[in-house]
Amino acid sequence: VVEAPVSNKNLVVEPCRSDFLVAIVPPGHPKANQETVNFAEIMEYPFICREEGSGTREVILDHVCHAEGCEDGLNVTMELGSPEAVKGAVEANMGISVVSRASIAKELKLGTLVAIDLDPPLERPFSFVHQKQKFRHRAMDELLEFARSYCKSHPEAV
């Protein structure tokens, strides 16, 4: 499963669903009571992001460059190697971040993070990717069928 566009002729890309990105802040943050936030507002705060090469980071930076202009950019104060590390830094009030809504279900339930919808919304496709092959393994076909079925029966989950 990948969250970025794939342009390799030797691969088959099957869309699964859209993933919506949201801003996250700790509960006491000045933006915590807002329903929506735009990137111009996010740029006012320290920004915590994933490491270079991360699909999430690329989507965010591409969006900021097109919407707000790269010359201003985000005030990146930390680059971390996992979604869990990003969420932990935001919970510790070290800055704001933008993550997949699906990745913060536990934190929202526990009340350790607040999700704020982005304006305009920012979404990315989640797709299954596999090699084009004349001869495919049965196990791979069964896994793909299971994943397709799961996506259809759980539209809210990723």
Predicted regions and their residues:
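Short beta-strand-centered segments that line the small-molecule binding cleft or hinge
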Residues: 1-21, 25, 33, 91-94, ...
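Structured beta->alpha junctions
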Residues: 5, 52, 78, 119-120, ...
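Secondary-structure junction motif
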Residues: 31, 47-68, 137-138, 153-158
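A late-sequence structural motif
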Residues: 114-157
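Alpha-helical segments flanking ligand/cofactor-binding loops in enzyme cores
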Residues: 14, 40, 87-88, 141
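Hydrophobic hinge/microswitch elements
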Residues: 3, 53, 65-113
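Small-molecule pocket liners
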Residues: 11-13, 18-23, 27-29, 37-39, ...
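Short alpha-helical
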Residues: 7-8, 54-55, 84-85, 103, ...
